[in-house]
Amino acid sequence: MARALAKKKNSEVAVMDEDMFAADAGIGVNDLGTDDLAIPFIKVLQKMSDELDDLDGAKAGDIYNTVTKEVAKGKDGVIVINCAYTLQHIEWEPRGTGTGAPHRIYGPGDELPQTERGDDNKDYVVDGNGRYLERTAQHYVLVVDKDGITQQALLPMKSTQFKKSKQWNSAMRAIKMKDRNGNLFTPPRFSHLWKLETVSEENKNGSWHGWQISKDSVVLD
């Protein structure tokens, strides 16, 4: 027999009992697979970002989570743990056409199609009807909130930000720690917290907001 939900009278103040949910922790969500979930991306909002039309108070230079819809001010930044990295070449349809999804994704070791550099510095696929390849550094991170709770996210870095990715990888590899015997070793990439902020950038082609990455502290647990 179905259990009826208890209702409070209008004069009573409803108080949530977390233990009621804790007893059934994970039911209905733990069995979800990757095909059932959206991938959260962390991105810097730009002047022409569509999200600015829908997010109250958001502005160019803010940091946006595409799944939670959370916005962090660029000057405040977010804290992340960098867990993994891969380099991909993503083949895109011409702007304004297609579904907005990649035409094809090439991983490390995949044979890339022949390309020609266009006047806009994009690498266009030869006989690809305007499709172009974009070299993209994919950083798989855990975003850490002020309470220490983490959430998985993907942080792509391409175009003007690709250099930032290389610098970040170099900074992680340069970290040295000492073991109990005083011997130096290189810790894993997920050993430290990093702060991601945003800064204004420009070149002869225009201006935008990009990442500013700094080491925060070592992961304690």
Predicted regions and their residues:
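Short, well-structured alpha-helical interface segments that form or flank functional binding sites
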Residues: 134-136, 150-152, 163-170, 186-189, ...
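Long, compositionally biased interface segments
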Residues: 173-221
